[in-house]
Curated annotation (Swiss-Prot):
Catalyzes the transfer of a phosphate group to glutamate to form L-glutamate 5-phosphate. Keywords: Amino-acid biosynthesis, ATP-binding, Cytoplasm, Kinase, Nucleotide-binding, Proline biosynthesis, Transferase. It catalyses: L-glutamate + ATP = L-glutamyl 5-phosphate + ADP. GO terms for cellular component: cytosol. ATP binds at K23, S182, D183, T222, G223, G224, M225, A226, S227, K228. The lineage of its organism: Bacteria, Bacillati, Actinomycetota, Actinomycetes, Mycobacteriales. This is Glutamate 5-kinase. Pathway: Amino-acid biosynthesis; L-proline biosynthesis; L-glutamate 5-semialdehyde from L-glutamate: step 1/2. It comes from Corynebacterium diphtheriae (strain ATCC 700971 / NCTC 13129 / Biotype gravis). Belongs to the glutamate 5-kinase family. The keyword Iron does not apply. Substrate binds at S63, D150, N162. SMART domains: PUA (SM00359). InterPro entries: AceGlu_kinase-like_sf, Asp/Glu/Uridylate_kinase, G5K_ProB, Glu/AcGlu_kinase, Glu_5kinase, Glu_5kinase/COase_Synthase, Glutamate_5-kinase_CS, PUA. Its EC number is 2.7.2.11.
Amino acid sequence: MNAQHSSADLRDVIRNAKRIVVKIGSSSLTGENFEVSPGRIDRIVEALEDRMHRGSDVIVVSSGAVAAGMAPLGLTSRPKDLATKQAAASVGQVHLANAWGNSFARYNRTIGQVLLTASDAGQRDRARNAQRTIDRLRLLHAVPIINENDTVATSEMHFGDNDRLAAIVSHLVSADALVLLSDVDGLYDKNPADPSARFVSEVRDGNDLKGVIAGDGGAVGTGGMASKVSAARLASRSGVPVLLTSADYVAEALGDAEVGTVFYPKDDRLSAWKFWALYAADTGGALRIDAGAVAAVTAGGNSLLAVGITEVIGDFHAGEIVEILGPEGEIIGRGEVAYDSAVLITMLGKQTAQLPEGLQRPVVHADYLSDYASRA
């Protein structure tokens, strides 16, 4: 949506979105003593059911597995070590799924649990399988309940938070909108305790986030709000409009969408492949390129040729996704490389005409190259 569109226009888009992803944070699903709260879940499901009754497809991204497993295991504080977190998640996931299932059963609806890891999203074939599973659940009139598979995810290979997972899922399923629900009502331009604090109702680009802090007084650069803003920007950069608000306003968020902060999407929605390559794919290595090549692949939208590559980093094979770095090591984007790293080393800095006939294809074709600058 461009500058001519108002916040009311964007809220109307979210209000009428046919396919919507709704992410709910742990604190909105659990009560005191870290137990799953059926009452809180029932209230959320009531709003979800009302939205589905209006004709929308709803995909739920649910946090809360680790928190829900703490009380049954006798844990009084959130575990810090990976093994205990995974044990809590394995117990909590059962309680959480039962709570969702029982609540939706009041409306004669079935749920389907989908547990994902970062490696699932990072491998293209596994990402497609996840997409097909979610699509089939919807066709069979089951509500997909998605969560990170904390039981098997490692500290090195995980989404980090379900906000990012929700952003990735929203693009994976071609959602028309993403709603992020937590325990904060939106963004402010200064501490809300300050009488002059202004509620930030819309974010069009990064400039609108300067000095912004969370509705609960926490800085955007710290804690949970940082991940929510990051996820909202991730989804909006890919072309998905986002509404960020408190779970206390779930009925309003899924009703008239007149609450919270909205994030404007880019007009040009990224293709599924480019989004996956840029934000989800595993990378096999990196290519450092010169300033001329940076301009060619960003402003020019051209393919990356061997002449502009100054360094090959890591060992990789043709067809893998690699990071593309600028002269100072800054990340420019990602792309699917056409040659093995061992072959590329022999091609560095050479004009296409200087290369053997079998090596004259672009190193990264423009169709398989995503740059971050175009999504700012």
